[in-house]
A protein has these predicted regions:
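Acidic, surface-exposed loops and disordered segments
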Residues: 1-329
Length: 329
């Protein structure tokens, strides 16, 4: 049993590398008496304003489950997933039951899991050559390479972000997950720290002021809030935009699994990426993207990744919760 617990701990450590909305890391793991693994949601980490239905949390759980399955494959195990429905108990909501099965060969996407990072800065001007070509073959991706298309996405992203930021409760919730100073005790644990957002100390200090209630509204009235939060120059530095879409009827768990795999496919090509989820969350932006780029009506836009080559510079470890928090009794 001790060996199995040790193995489970190693699998959870690998699974924790998966992305989650705002890096909230809502997924918890419990070893059941029958040897299966229960996947649970820490409901205290739900984004009550940004994700009231819990869809983004479930996509995050799906990514974590895929990370677990990738790690298990390297140990010769496959993973059977049984979605669970049920009420929360002590702030933990049942999500899925995982059962390990033998005979699995290592998944080739397991290795890029340690390479994958979100890069939110301007991409290097270096050419990507044919590196993007394999992404064209995915049936759930529309790849935009024309400068005019990338510029259109950049403008849509800024407009959608401004509409969303005008919602003060959303901004307050976002700020609560932003770690804008290295003095924040949660800098290396969770949320979005300034380093991960490619912010200088000055930019991080400015963000804490600009996004504050009252200040943002005043800046918006005089027409400067939009330019201050604009990302268009950064987005236009991308070599391509990948519109990632999935079937409307697909469960968020399945969407999350494929979302993580696609991001790992990007990393395996030596590319960096940053998702622009606001383009899917904002109805006006999502509608224009559907019309402009021919997304079928039975498909849901999940996000738009900006893709390119990140400049080489040292980065700290990914902010992650300790394993004794992720594994629950």
């Amino acid at each position: 049993m001790n060996q199995f617990v040790s193995e489970l701990t190693a699998l959870v450590a690998e699974a924790s590398l998966a992305p989650s909305v705002h890096n909230t890391q809502p997924t918890r793991w419990r070893l059941a008496a029958d040897g299966s693994i229960l996947v649970l949601e820490d409901t205290l980490r739900r984004l009550k304003i940004g994700d009231p239905t819990g869809r983004d949390a479930d996509v995050s759980h799906g990514a974590a489950i895929e990370g677990f399955a990738l790690a298990a494959s390297c140990r010769g195990f496959g993973v059977a997933v049984e979605p669970l429905l049920g009420p929360s108990l002590a702030e933990l909501r049942p999500v899925a039951r995982l059962s390990l099965v033998t005979g699995q060969t290592p998944d080739e996407l397991a290795r890029p899991a340690r390479l994958r990072r979100t890069y939110r800065g301007a991409f290097a001007p270096a050419r990507t050559g044919t590196a993007l070509d394999p992404l064209e073959r995915a049936d759930d991706v529309v790849l935009l390479r024309k400068a005019s298309d990338i510029a259109q996405i950049a403008a849509l992203n800024d407009a959608a972000s401004l509409r969303l930021y005008r919602h003060a409760p959303f901004r307050a919730e976002l700020l609560s997950w932003m770690r804008l100073s290295r003095g924040d005790p949660r800098w290396s644990i969770d949320g979005l720290n300034a380093e991960a957002m490619e912010m200088s100390r000055l930019e991080a200090a400015g963000a804490s002021i600009v996004l504050a209630r009252g200040v943002f509204e005043t800046l918006d009235r005089i027409g400067v809030a939009g330019p201050l939060i604009a990302e268009a120059p950064v987005v236009r530095s991308a070599k391509a935009i990948a519109l990632f879409h999935r079937p409307e009827a697909e469960t968020p768990l399945e969407t999350g699994r494929r979302f993580y795999r696609f991001w790992l496919e990007i990393a395996a090509l030596g590319l960096s990426a940053s998702p622009m989820a606001v383009l899917a969350d904002d109805p006006l932006a999502a509608s224009e993207i559907r019309q402009s780029f021919g997304l079928p009506l039975d498909r849901r836009l999940i996000t738009a990744f900006r893709l390119g080559l990140a400049p080489r510079h040292p980065t700290g470890p990914k902010p992650r919760l300790p394993l004794d928090t992720l594994l629950v009794a």
